[in-house]
Structures are given as C-alpha cells and as structure tokens.
Regions:
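Non-catalytic substrate-recognition/targeting regions of SAM-dependent transferases
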Residues: 60-73, 89-158, 166
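S-adenosylmethionine
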Residues: 234-312
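Conserved SAM-binding motif I beta-strand of class I
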Residues: 199-204
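C-terminal catalytic and target-recognition region of SAM-dependent MTase-like enzymes
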Residues: 288-353
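S-adenosyl-L-methionine
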Residues: 208-252
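Conserved SAM-binding loop of SAM-dependent methyltransferases across substrates and taxa
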Residues: 185-198
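Conserved class I S-adenosyl-L-methionine
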Residues: 174-184
C-alpha cells in the first residue's frame, strides 16, 4: 500500500538475507550514520570498558546495535572486525574510519572474512595500528585467557559464554570433578579450576586443543599436568568413561552446531538428543549437567524437548530439574524484531538421584 517501512539493504551473506538499518526515510549509509550507531554502542559498553577484571567483550553486535553484517570485538585495546556480508564489506573503509574515530583507546585492528568471496581475501589479517603480542593475555572476571588475534577465524575464547563460565566457576566448581566436552581451548575447564574444582577433564577431537588447553591453565598459574586433557572423539570418550564407570559432578556440553569428523557427522538439530542420552550416565548422583547450543535454527522449546527426551532415553527413572537458563550477555545486543539473533541457549540441569 506504499507505506514506508524502513531503509534496508539486501544481499547474499553469511547470516540472513537482508537487514533494516533505519526507520527514517532516505537515511544514507554515511559518516553520520556510522558515527551515531558506534557512539551509542560505545556508551552502552562503558561499564565493561571501565572494568578492571574484564578486558574482552563484544563492542558492536551487528543488527543488535543498528547495522547487521559486521561485528567488532574488544581484546584489551585491540579490535577484531568480523565481516559477514560482502555487501557490507564494500563499506569497509567508511566503517573502519568511523569505528577508529569513535572507539577510544584502540591499539590495533584485525579483521575476519566470514563470507564467501571470489577475491580470495584472507580469512584473517592485521589491518593497522600496533600488532598484538602472541599470545595476547586478556581478563574475563579476573581469569586470564591466552588469545591470538591472527590465527584463522577464532581467537581462543568464545566471548558469548562469559556469564556461563562465571556461573560455573561460582556455583558448580568448588570441590567438584568437572568434565568439559567439545572443550576447544579449555576455557570452561580453566574457569572450573579457578573456582576450586578438584579435577577437570577436557575432551576435544582437534589436535590443537592439547597445547591450547595447557596454555590456558599455565597462564593462570595452574600446572596442566594436574588436569586431564584428552585429544579424542567425544563420543569415543563417552564409551571409554562408561567402561571405566567414571562419574563427574559437573558435566559441560557445548558442541558446534555442525561438525564432521572421519567417523561421524554431528548436527545439533538432529543429534543433540542422542548426545544428551550418551552423556547423562556420566553425571554423578546429584550432579549438574550444563547443556549449551549456539544453533539459531533450534528454538528454546525445541532445545528443551531434545534435552528431556535424551535424559529419559538414557535413564528414564532419574529425577532432574532445570534450575537455570542462560543466554547472550548484554554486550551481545539482540533486536526484538530478529529473535534468531538470540542464538545462545544454555540449560543448567540438576539431578536428584
């Protein structure tokens, strides 16, 4: 009916098909636009920027802060700009110029290319300023993490799990044995150890996970040899643990949305319930199961159904309750109009027998 709805751009990209960037008719993507949204994002993170015990977080969260297709992460003064849209990348110079003009204290800039492109752009590169040391040690709630600004798309820590790590440290670590599956660089394990866990066990199929996990313990003054680290398929570890009758007080499960190894293909949408069924027997009586997914195509209600079905399939008579649900922290701003952007779902489940 020819009613104006908003200004948007449409294009092929890693996430989504199109984004509305303004409700103002004829608003241009210019210096004033980007300066405005960056200033608002910066002000909304003032508390984090002033924090002495947290020096890494999401500084600009794409559509949640007014413009989809690009995110900016803060690592103790170094910023990592991730591009999800080739169309948005055409505004690269304008966006970087306004970001550097707005965000105070930037030491160096890195970028990640997360869209398919025909120009063969490197997936990770240093853009300018001062290069970060390797590793760059950042703080999260007082815990140190070794990060790498220019080692592929990942840096060594998933910033969206900050509140989950802190919850595990504060409530589910002291005096407990902790199993961390799909452990990546062992960040959950380090948080648990710093929270007083008597033993942590980290399991990941990637060869790099061993040295990376050892490093995360070491930078916090924890001897890696006092912890257990396995480089093996998580599902094979389940079989090993059941055979050895191993039980853990806290079990953390945070698989990728989709993964393929030589032995199997895993998809959260299809296989998470089976995963829960296999890991439930490893949870000690009155233990805690922490289940996480970043699959945007799985709703919270669907996720809960998968979990409940998996537990019942494994041990139908076992009593349990969901005691806590966590999602994205406030720096990962989510627009009300795009619920799929609110992708992180984490359930804390306590067993009573």
């Amino acid at each position: 009916q020819r009613h104006f709805l908003g200004m948007a751009y449409v294009g092929f990209q890693n996430k989504g098909v199109a984004w509305v960037y303004s409700r103002e008719e004829d608003e241009a993507l210019d210096d004033a636009f980007f300066s405005g949204i960056f200033k608002t994002a910066f002000e909304n993170r003032r508390a984090l920027l002033r924090s002495e015990d947290t020096t890494t977080f999401r500084l600009f969260n794409g559509e949640g802060d007014g413009f989809g297709g690009v995110t900016i992460d803060w690592y103790d003064g170094f910023i990592v700009v991730s591009w999800y849209s080739e169309g948005v990348y055409h505004y690269r110079d304008l966006i970087l110029t306004q970001a550097l003009a707005t965000f105070e204290g930037v030491k160096g800039v890195y970028e990640k290319i997360r869209f398919k492109n025909e120009a063969d752009l490197p997936e990770s590169s240093f853009v300018g300023g001062v290069e970060a040391p390797e590793p760059l040690i950042v703080l999260e709630n007082g815990i140190k993490y070794a990060t790498y600004m220019n080692e592929g798309l990942m840096t060594g820590i998933f910033l969206d799990q900050r509140e989950v790590r802190e919850t595990i440290r504060q409530r589910y670590s002291a005096g407990r044995t902790v199993l961390n599956t799909f452990s990546y660089t062992g960040a959950f394990s380090v948080a648990a150890a710093m929270g007083g866990a008597t033993q942590t066990t980290s399991v990941d199929v990637a060869n790099r996970s061993l040295e990376k996990t050892k490093e995360q313990f070491a930078v916090n003054g924890i001897d890696p040899e006092t912890q257990q680290i396995y480089v093996m398929d998580v599902f094979d570890y389940f079989k090993y643990a059941v055979k050895k009758q191993l039980k853990f007080d806290t079990v953390v499960v945070d698989p990728p949305s989709f993964a393929r190894t030589k032995k199997r293909t895993f998809s959260v949408a299809k296989d998470y319930g089976k995963l829960v069924a296999q890991i439930t027997p490893l949870v000690a009586p009155k233990g805690t199961l922490v289940l996480s997914t970043n699959a945007a195509n799985v709703s919270e209600s669907q996720f809960q159904q998968m979990i409940e079905k998996g537990i019942q399939e494994a041990e139908g008579n076992r009593k349990f309750r969901i005691v806590l649900k966590k999602g994205l922290p406030s720096d990962f701003a989510v627009p009300v109009a795009t619920p799929l952007s609110d992708y992180l779902k984490v359930f804390f489940i306590e067993f009573n027998n």
